[in-house]
Amino acid sequence: MDLAPLRAPTPPAWVAEAVRRWPELLADHANCEKKAASTALALMFAYPEDRELTARLSRLAREELRHFEQVDRLMQDQGLPYLRQKPGRYASRLRAALRTHEPFRKLDLLLSGALIEARSCERFRLLASLPEGAGLPAPVAALYAALEASEARHYQLYLRLAERHAQEAGLAERRAEAGALIATRLAELAVIEAEAATSPDTEFRFHSGEPAAGEPAVGEPVLRESDLSAREP
């Protein structure tokens, strides 16, 4: 499938804020890794009869928890305390758009998971590629560079699981039809994701929107399937 999941780039103002407030960024990133593992486990509990899904997401959950350990260790190395932060708006806005009846609920859960992983991949890339001296502390930038490929794999895994579900649930008879169905629904959810990730936001989080005034430019895709190509976990 030739999909372009993200409909708007991360605002430059968010990147600047992330550099300025990197201790808070790390704290929320640690929370995000735990939430990602929790999401995978929730899907395993919701659909235990789907053996491929449970096997794949079991591995993904373990990897997300290893990432949490890496972030937590880095925070300790940097002398940063653990911060309790209330959730941002990003995930809740995506959840509000998901359908509640099967087989569409499962499809939307998988596609929203793909979008979140794609946004994480994009932000890791942006932060890791900043010039030395103008970006994050070197250990933080190095960790984000290392994590980018994992987020790409997770994005692709969620998409593959969604495509398989579309066929097995009878939403599409052939793979090409499943791809078209997924592309349509992914594009719909991507508009909501882009608004949450780019519109003015009063809180700073790993997936928050622009911290300054201004309207987001939601339009052409900015991150394509080829940018996220990587081996499956």
Descriptions of predicted regions:
Residues 1-233:
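Non-heme di-metal
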